[in-house]
């Protein structure tokens, strides 16, 4: 029972048998805490439960939570690969009590699991407690039979946990194992506690206080439990190895890397194999949860992780992209526990392959610069932080990659100067994930949710209903009434108004009663499932307890339904045309348009867009029934229902099926398009009317966007396009069918005329005749040196060099200078010197003289041919005279 997968199952099943609900891991991108970059602990998804802002149907829970610590406050990136225990991605096993059992039961459950189920020996174990927590110490004596020397009292914050400056907090107790004298280190609290001999593997947090202010702490009415055990650490203990990288999971990933490289690790490069194995996990899980590499926020952290792994692959001799070729091994090991890996496998591979391909183009160049700039440094020296920033900013080298490359030489990077140069980018990155400061405003909604419960949504079946006002909010505070002319928010016990979510905008409409009219301008979800109607009282006054008639804007809702259903059709059509890697990244479903963002690494061609549009419209024309079914989430996924990456779903979900295959098959739903979706949809695909794609663009690296219209809007757009095409055909004196050929012929004719005009201008520039005899009349003799100098018109800079070469041949011996003025008044000049004179005159020197007159700075080229420019083309004549003066001087 020592394999990672078996350890995970044993832990979860043990707590399930002891009355705990097994709760799926939440995504790595926190849904309820914008101040966190990544989920880094098991309690994150339960934060609002602990604070009392959210209620769950259970009081005990157990999870295996995927976590990342590679950015922000918790950052283990630099240590990964070089220590026995640091990881960027890890699984935290945990059990939680929300006001149910407390210290004694928590300690008893932990002790029985590790000694009975996991078989750990008592004489190898010891624990820490907060120095004043006599209660916990007493329970350890009672339950485990520990003597005082096995219960170490710690007076620091290491054994007192707090959620923040205020809120739930309490002492904690950590469980350690002594791994033997062959490993350096001392017990916790000793001078050598940072060694690896005594390994902490489980932390039991006893939430028993509420930190009201800095100086005031009061007991919580319902104390809670939050525990966290590192799965990888426990695996190393049970498998009898000293490093997490020697456990079965990591050995399989390292073996896959060895197979791909054609060689195994050596003592010198073992760290690189470990880095690749760890970073493969964190990168893959982040991509599966919807994070893509970019230059800011979470995407930047992902890029740092990926590029660090790619750098180590390069150190191991990989000549081609490596990481994407290892994804299958990770899916094999962890796909059963985390099915999102299986669903996202193709997307992970494609994202990694393209990122590594991009990075390899600049890696060699950046490393060459790094080697050049650090060539004079020796062990103990400091590498300039400004240069490190240039490597990041210009070549995409994250700081940690630069540090990693210099680590083996014993050279450090000047972090202070790097940070100074990086401040703006860091601020921008933080802005993409830091909280917006709305927590105080949001508190009113959580308070109301606690008091009122969830709003009953009726909008799947009706657009009209009656409801009773249960709360009124104005300027972020509860009020007893809203008067005519006042804007605010109304909550009713039940509503047909759809609240904005899943990309679908909120409904608008009116709430009315005798002499009362409230115009709803938006409907939003607050505190999870509290439907809030925002708007203005146009007539009368609305008070708590009033009964209102609720009427959704029917025409607007109908248009939204069509656009939402069309989004599903386009999603499936994109997968058919472009591949299974297509995954939704976001959407907007509005009454007048829709847009759909998805993972794809290159622009979509017009032919591909046409195919996508045709496939979607074929389903529309079939006019099949749209089937909606409530299902268990696992059954829905088994039926092939597509889910939004990174989204957290409840135990029961709505499944929307479209297309000929949509039919009843007992507990499963099959269809041409099958998605988990809480939005509103048409009854039949024919109700969409028509789908018209109006645009395609890039949103971010690896993310594309299509925009489309449906129904009347699509028809109007198509009619407008046809009218424009007919008008164009009329102007071209052709038919619609023949217009493409007519346009091609006209474009060919235009190119021909442009070429002829260009040749004519060149001849005119060189004297006006094909023989070029007119040019000879412009030649001056300056001290025995022939100078051909002209200001020409209508000549592009790219043609000037050819004309100068032609002039040099005509002169035989001499200097030729041509100045052309562009439409915006800028001047360009090219100077040529025949081979026999380059020892006396440099074209570069002469062209710089002319450039100064034109208001330019310098110029460049070779002694026989050089060019320059300046903003003032009106001084072309004076520029030529400057060249003449230089020759005569």
From Swiss-Prot:
Its cofactor is Zn(2+). Its EC number is 6.1.1.7. Its main location: cytoplasm. Transmembrane segments: none annotated. Pfam families: DHHA1 (PF02272), tRNA-synt_2c (PF01411), tRNA_SAD (PF07973). Disulfide bonds: none annotated. It comes from the Bacteria. NCBIfam families: alaS (TIGR00344). HAMAP family: Ala_tRNA_synth_B (MF_00036_B). This is Alanine--tRNA ligase. It comes from Rhodopseudomonas palustris (strain ATCC BAA-98 / CGA009). The lineage of its organism: Bacteria, Pseudomonadati, Pseudomonadota, Alphaproteobacteria, Hyphomicrobiales.
């Amino acid at each position: 029972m020592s394999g990672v997968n078996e350890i995970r199952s044993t832990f979860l099943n043990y707590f399930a048998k002891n009355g705990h609900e097994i709760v799926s891991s939440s995504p790595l991108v926190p849904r309820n805490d914008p101040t966190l970059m990544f989920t880094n602990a098991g309690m994150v998804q339960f934060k609002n439960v602990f604070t009392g802002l959210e209620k769950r149907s259970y009081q005990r829970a157990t999870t295996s939570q995927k976590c990342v610590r590679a950015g922000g406050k918790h950052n283990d990136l630099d240590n990964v690969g070089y220590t026995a225990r640091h990881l960027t991605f890890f699984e935290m096993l945990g059990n939680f009590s929300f006001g149910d059992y407390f210290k004694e039961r928590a300690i008893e459950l932990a002790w029985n699991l590790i000694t009975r189920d996991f078989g750990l020996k008592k004489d190898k174990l010891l624990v820490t407690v907060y120095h004043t927590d006599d209660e916990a110490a007493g329970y350890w004596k009672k339950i485990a039979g520990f003597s005082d020397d096995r219960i170490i009292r710690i007076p620091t914050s290491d054994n007192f946990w707090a959620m923040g400056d205020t809120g739930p907090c309490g002492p904690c107790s950590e469980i350690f194992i002594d791994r033997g004298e062959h490993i350096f280190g001392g017990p916790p609290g000793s001078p050598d506690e940072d060694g690896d001999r005594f390994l902490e593997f489980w932390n039991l947090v006893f939430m028993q206080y509420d930190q009201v202010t800095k100086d005031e702490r009061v007991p919580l009415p319902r104390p809670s439990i939050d525990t966290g055990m590192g799965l990888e650490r426990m695996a190393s203990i049970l498998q009898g190895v000293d490093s997490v990288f020697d456990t079965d999971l990591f050995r399989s990933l390292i073996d896959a890397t060895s197979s791909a490289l054609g060689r195994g690790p050596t003592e010198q490069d073992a760290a690189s194999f470990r880095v690749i194995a760890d970073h493969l996990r964190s990168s893959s899980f982040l991509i599966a949860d919807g994070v893509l590499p970019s230059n800011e926020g979470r995407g930047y952290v992902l890029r740092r992780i990926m590029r660090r792994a790619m750098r180590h692959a390069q150190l191991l001799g990989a000549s081609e992209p490596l990481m994407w070729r290892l994804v299958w091994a990770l899916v094999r090991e962890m796909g059963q526990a985390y099915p999102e890996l299986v669903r996202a496998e193709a997307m992970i591979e494609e994202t990694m392959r393209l990122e590594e391909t991009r990075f390899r183009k600049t890696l060699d160049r950046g490393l060459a610069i790094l080697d050049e700039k650090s060539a004079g440094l020796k062990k103990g020296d400091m590498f300039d932080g400004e240069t490190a920033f240039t490597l990041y900013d210009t070549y995409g080298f994250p700081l940690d990659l630069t540090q990693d490359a210099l680590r083996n030489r014993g050279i450090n990077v000047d972090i202070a100067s790097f940070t100074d140069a990086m401040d703006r980018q860091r601020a921008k990155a933080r802005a993409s994930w830091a909280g917006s400061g709305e927590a105080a405003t949001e508190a009113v909604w959580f308070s109301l949710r606690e008091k009122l419960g969830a709003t009953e949504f009726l909008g799947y079946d009706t657009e009209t209903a009656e409801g009773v006002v249960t709360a009124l909010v104005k300027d972020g505070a509860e009020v007893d009434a809203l008067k005519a002319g006042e804007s605010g928010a109304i909550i009713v016990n039940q509503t047909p108004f759809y609240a904005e979510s899943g990309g679908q905008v909120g409904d608008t409409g009116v709430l009315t009663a005798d002499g009362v009219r409230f115009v709803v301008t938006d409907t939003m979800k607050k505190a999870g499932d509290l439907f809030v109607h925002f708007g203005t009282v146009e007539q009368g006054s609305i008070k708590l307890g009033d009964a209102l008639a609720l009427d959704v804007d029917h025409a607007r809702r109908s248009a939204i339904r069509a656009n939402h259903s069309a989004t599903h059709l386009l999603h499936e059509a994109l997968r058919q045309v472009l591949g299974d890697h297509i995954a939704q990244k976001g959407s907007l479903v509005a009454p007048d348009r829709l847009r759909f963002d998805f993972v794809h690494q290159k622009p979509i061609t017009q032919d591909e867009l046409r195919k996508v549009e045709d496939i979607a419209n074929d389903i529309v024309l079939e006019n099949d029934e749209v089937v909606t079914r409530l299902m268990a989430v696992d059954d829905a996924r088994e039926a092939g229902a597509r889910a939004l990456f990174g989204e957290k779903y409840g135990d029961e979900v709505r499944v929307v099926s479209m297309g000929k295959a949509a039919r009843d098959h007992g507990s499963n739903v099959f269809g041409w398009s099958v998605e988990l979706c809480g939005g509103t949809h048409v009854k039949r695909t024919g109700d969409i009317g028509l789908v018209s794609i109006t645009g395609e663009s890039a949103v971010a690296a690896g993310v594309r966007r299509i925009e489309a219209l449906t129904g009347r809007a699509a028809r109007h757009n198509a009619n407008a396009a046809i009218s424009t095409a007919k008008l164009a055909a009329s102007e071209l004196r052709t038919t619609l069918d023949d217009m493409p050929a007519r346009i091609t012929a006209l474009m060919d004719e235009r190119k021909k005329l442009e070429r002829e005009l260009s040749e004519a201008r060149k001849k005119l520039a060189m004297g006006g005749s094909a023989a070029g005899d007119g040019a000879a009349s412009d030649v001056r003799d300056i001290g025995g040196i022939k100078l051909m100098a002209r200001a020409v018109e209508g000549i592009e800079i790219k043609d000037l060099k050819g004309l100068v070469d032609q002039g040099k041949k005509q002169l035989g011996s001499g200097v030729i200078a041509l100045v052309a003025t562009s439409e915006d008044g800028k001047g360009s000049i090219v100077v040529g010197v025949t081979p026999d004179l380059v020892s006396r005159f440099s074209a570069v020197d002469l062209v710089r003289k002319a450039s100064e007159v034109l208001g330019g700075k310098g110029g460049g080229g070779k002694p026989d041919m050089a060019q320059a420019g300046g903003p003032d083309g009106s001084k072309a004549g004076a520029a030529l005279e400057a060249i003449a003066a230089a020759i005569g001087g």
